[in-house]
Amino acid sequence: MDELINLLIMDQVTLYEHVKSIDNPNYIKSIVPNGGILFIPLDEERYPLLCTHLDTINDFNDRPAPSIVDILIDGDTLSLNPYSSCSCLGGDDRCGVYTALKLINSNVPYAFGFFLDEEIGGVGSDKIGISSVMPYENITAFIGLDRRGKDQVALYGYDSVNLINVFEQEGYKTVYGTFTDASNLAKYWDIACINLSVGYYNEHTTSE
C-alpha cells in the first residue's frame, strides 16, 4: 500500500524521473524523449508488451498530484479527500504503473512501456510507436494495465481469440473500450491488444 501511495503523490514529471532511474540487469531500458520509457527483456525472442501511462487527469487539468493528506485509507481502499483540490486520486493509471513495477522487480520476462500523456490522446505512445526502439517483430501482444474495475478485459478491434480466452478462463468479462496506449500501438502493426482491469473505479472524478 505504501508503494502505491508513493506513486499517487508524484506528478507525471517526478514519476517519469523515478521510472527512468530504475536499473534492472534483466532488461534493456530505452528512453524516448517526450514519449516514455521501455524495458525490454534480455535473451527473450517473443514477449507481450505491458502498457501503462504516467500522466493522470490532474496533469490534464493542471491540478497538483495528491498529497498525503489528500488520500484517505479505509482498509485496502484508497480514495480522495473530498476537500482536496485535485481532480482525481490518480489510480488511472498509477495502479497500472504499480503493477508493472512489481513485475519488473520480479524479473518477469515481458516488455514494459511507461508512456507520457495518454490522457491527451496517447502522445507518448505515438512517439514510441514510430520510433526505432519499438521491437515490433518480437511483440506477441499489447496488454494494457489501464482498465477500471477488477475483472474486465477490454477490446479495441485488434483481437486474438486465444488471448481473450486466457483471461475469460480466469473469470474476466469481455467489454469494449474506446482508447488506451495498447490500442494506440496496435494500430501501427495490427498486433493484438487487450486492456486489463487494475483495480481503480470512478476514474477522472473526485470520487475515484
Give short role names for the model-derived ranges.
Residues 2-45:
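A non-catalytic alpha/beta surface segment that caps or lines the substrate-entry region
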Residues 25-30, 47-48, 110, 172, ...:
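Hydrophobic anchor at the start of a short beta-strand
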Residues 173-208:
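Zn-dependent metallopeptidase/amidohydrolase metal-coordination segment
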Residues 31, 42-109:
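Active-site metal-coordination/substrate-binding segment of hydrolases
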Residues 57-59, 120, 150-152, 201-203:
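Short, acidic Gly/Pro/Ser/Thr-rich loop/turn segments
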Residues 85-167, 174-175, 182:
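Acidic/histidine-rich catalytic neighborhood of metal-dependent amide-processing enzymes
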